[in-house]
Amino acid sequence: MLMIKILLFLWLVNFTPPLLAFFLDDKLARPLDFGKRFKDGKPLLGPNKTWRGLISAVAAGSLLALLFGFPLWIGFSAALLSMTGDLISSFTKRRFAKPSGKNFPVLDQFFEGALPFIVLTPHFQLGLLESTVLIFLFCLGAYIGSVFYKSILMEEPSPWYPRKLKAKTRFKEISSCSPDFRYFYPLIHFEEAVYYHRIIKCFFRITGLYKSGKKNALNIGIVHKLVTLPRLPEEFNNLNIIYFSDLHIDGLEELVPEINRILKKETPDICIFGGDLRMSSYGDYSTCLNLFSKIILKIKSRYGIYAVLGNHDCLEMIPVMENMGIRVLLNDSVKIEKNGQSIYLVGVDDPHYYNCANVEMASSDIPGDAFKIFLCHSPEVYQEAEQAGMDLYLCGHTHAGQVQLPKIGPVFTHSRSPRSIAHGFWKLGDMQGYTSSGVGVSGVTVRFLTRGEILSLTLIK
């Protein structure tokens, strides 16, 4: 039992710095070497060795000592020695010009595993064999963890990877979109797998509300709206946009013919899909793409079809969508011209789950006085968009709550933005916005006091 405690203690101490890096990214991550270089001109330790990591590991060691029944001084000193070993490894790697953050078996694990036994061996009266076995097991476990963190979470999955490489983002991508993780989906996405698909759905069935709720969900329609925009170029007066989002189409396939019935009657200038193809936020996405292709065939748009990704979507969907003729805007913009005048569509990545929306990057190549239509899956970056000078903000995600209560409104909006912009028109400064209730449903296939919609929006100068 003692050997298991020691092994867990060492693993947890060394797991603390990358765990904090996972959740905090670059916050409080001041380099231990202050960016200084050794006399060979190479970094002393490198940017990945931080005061945050050192202090947190030593603090964790002290707390773990109390938890495991070790003397406090043992926890403190063993953790400090382990971090000292880690710094020795980093210093050695820098001298041989080994890049920071890359895996180097044995060198990465040995010193941080062995140095703590300066105090652990005499205090616990461990034999040479016991200490050697513990060091070996520590190195093996630490190496496996390092491979997962550095070679999977911190390795770009493809040459065209468009997002800033962060461990938290990669973990979300892998756990939501990789088939290799399919057996772990219910554990990682517990809220959706159990709460929505089991508990909430069961509630609606027991109360007898499920049938009527599903009927409401299938009762979608088209809403025709006008918006007056003083800065709209004259050539684009009466521009018509078809905007639809939140299909979640593999969860309610009966919607496909109704969507097609509506869309085949429309001849918009621009068609925009606002994200969320898949019903679940994890698992297979081939079905929703196949169903989506049947919908896209019905769309006739003068200036093309554009899309942004939602929190239920995967980067792997982009090539398939582009093969359908859709231009996916991922922190990017596109210029639309007519008779010498132009407008810009500015689309950002998902701001809700993946938290990868970058308004500054998306609008970086646009003239400051240009007319800009901002496309985002959710209303959550409304303040950044207004500060960037957007004229019109189009989004979805909230489903207008999907389930509303009389005189109260949405039970949940699943958005960090104010409830006042959860559906319909809204305004911030000179920017006008519209939040769609979406077409499909999420979680449970019901709606109450809300209706799925396809928006036909006409822009008036």
Where are these regions (language model features)?
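Interhelical loop and helix-boundary elements at the membrane-water interface
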Residues: 1-65, 69-73, 83-118, 128-132, ...
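Acidic, His/Gly-rich catalytic cores of divalent-metal-dependent hydrolytic chemistry
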Residues: 142-191, 201-222, 430-431, 435-461
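N-terminal active-site segment of His-dependent metallophosphoesterases
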Residues: 196-286
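Beta-strand-turn-beta hairpins that frame and shape the catalytic cleft
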Residues: 220, 229-242, 334-347, 367, ...
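Active-site neighborhood of phospho(di)ester-bond hydrolases with catalytic His/Asp-centered motifs
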Residues: 242-245, 270-276, 303-311, 329-331, ...
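Core catalytic region of metal-dependent phosphoesterases/phosphodiesterases
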Residues: 253-338
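Binuclear metal-dependent hydrolase catalytic cores centered on His/Asp/Glu-rich metal-binding motifs
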Residues: 323-324, 339-376, 382-383, 444-448
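Conserved beta-sheet core of the metallophosphoesterase superfamily
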Residues: 379-455
